[in-house]
Amino acid sequence: MTDLSHPNPQFSAADAEKLAIEVFGVTATASPLDSERDRNFRLETGTDADWILKIVNASEPQVESEFQTALLHHLSNADAKLAVPQLKPSLSGDVLASAVATGGERHAMRLVGWLPGVPLAEVKRTFELMRNLGRSLGELDHALQGFIHPGAVRELDWDLRHAGRARTRLHFVRDADRRALLERFIVRFENHVAPKLSRLRAQVIHNDANDWNVLVSKGDHEQIAGLIDFGDAVHTVLIAEVAIACAYSILDMEDPIGAAAALAAGFHEKYPLKAEEIDLLFDLIAMRLVTSVTFSASRHDKTDDNPYLAISEAPAWRLLEKMDAMNPRFATAILRKACGFDAIEGAGAVRKWIADNSKTFAPIVRPAPATMTKALVPYGDATHFMTVASAEQRAKEATEWWDNFCAENNVQLGIGPWGEKRTVYTDTAFESRFIEGQRRIHHLGVDLFMPAGTPLYTPLAATVVSVEIEREPLGYGGLVKLEHRPEGCPPFVTLWGHMAHEALGRLKPGQKLKAGDLVGHMGDIHENGGWTPHLHFEMTTDINLTATEILGVGEAAYLDVWADVFPDVAALAGIPPETFHQDGRTRAEIIAKRKEILLPNLSISYSEPIKFVRGDGTWLID
């Protein structure tokens, strides 16, 4: 392993020009390039054939220098689609030459082709660029599959399997809050990630696809032109390639996890990832950043004049702070969904089981919702009086309007549908943790509006997980969480929000409920978070979430993810699909069509013809 404290090779630009002509037969003008531990020079020949002279740190073992040379040679023969530096043999035919510094130290040396392009760090990042980067890295690693060399199996602090070593550098971080932030990521790594790494696929990877090593096309900044600097290549877990590329390429993006998901999806397209690899990706992205900032902190007193080491430190801290505010389970759900997996393992099976068994559920209210007259609550209309009054926490006025509407229109049950876009969520608590400047405005449960005190019953056998009170304005008020484990279905959880507080004294964690048993009652304004009385009914396929971690509303960009994590619960609540949409002709269109094609002697039995909306077995449903 290279000793990072060993000084860089001591060669000047003039020395580089002399070595280029004497060893490689290349006449060129040399200019130094930033490097963490080696000495690199760009050699400009005045033609299109420019070169990079890499003089290796004397502390790097010979076998590691030979490994990098063998790797580049392998890629040149593998016809990898991603452009990588091409080796130029010395005049004596060696691709790995040597040079002696003025102090007498001998250094390995190689000459590689200069790749045209613009560093990723200097262009605007888009999801399409991230996806193309993922594709390019997937093609590269697919080409490296099966390649091995003795120098690839080495101790390297930048190997993400050893990211926990960052703990030994924490004391160099002077700010206490930042140390605590890093500690949280390290603890997660030690407890939840490190024990699983040995079971993942491993191979040789580039291991440093940072935004200065990735080149994009000068003419099209969404196309990848090449990848340089294989100095950190190592045999390690495959998913580290994706994590490292994400850590640098998503810096300062408005939606960093969305960008990471695009990159992972591109990689998956060319070199399919496994679910257990994606499950660790969020933490591995964070730990690459933790490794970077702790190394920078440990070297501040020695390397303040080396811009390479601190080049991404400030953006790295910003990204770490964003990631610290995210729920890792939701971030992982986004990454899984982007690669074609269920956002939560088993989510698809839960949704199918509910659809297949919807006729067997006990009614959540009595009489059953399907038999009641229903109307959609106008929360989807941003300008409606009830919406505005609710957002301004004038719940009594909103309730009065709704009660009057129900009385005038004979409405027994009000419905707030899943996925509905709403502007009623005005509190800062609804700001997105994932997308900068956006809010969570799409409803992820189903609301049932009935008078305060209405009894509510579980549609399935359940175990009480928690009963609590959320007292924040526009919060849930009384909150009950039940777990269901029906035969033939993965377990899932239902959430019952805006409940009366009486449930707190009646239900206990671990208590068993049979289908049709009482859960609680709809809470009044003073105990339900300050809302018109209703039940927020929701389910989640992630049984590890606490009641308060379950999102009631989500971002538009991730509705497909939330549909897995928090599926539409309407069928479980017994609300028929025609409540939300009806297909086919209107009643007036049907009458007109009947008059057109039926003889006058074929009478219509009803003064107002029935509009049938669907069939169900032998029944027609109007």
Indicate residue ranges for each PLM-predicted region.
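A conserved alpha-helical element in kinase catalytic cores
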Residues: 55-106, 122-124, 128-131
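Active-site-adjacent loop/helix segments that line or gate small-molecule/cofactor pockets in enzymes
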Residues: 583-614
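A cross-family kinase active-site recognition segment
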Residues: 91, 122-177, 200-202
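Active-site activation/catalytic loop segments of kinase-like enzymes and analogous catalytic loops
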Residues: 239-272, 286-303
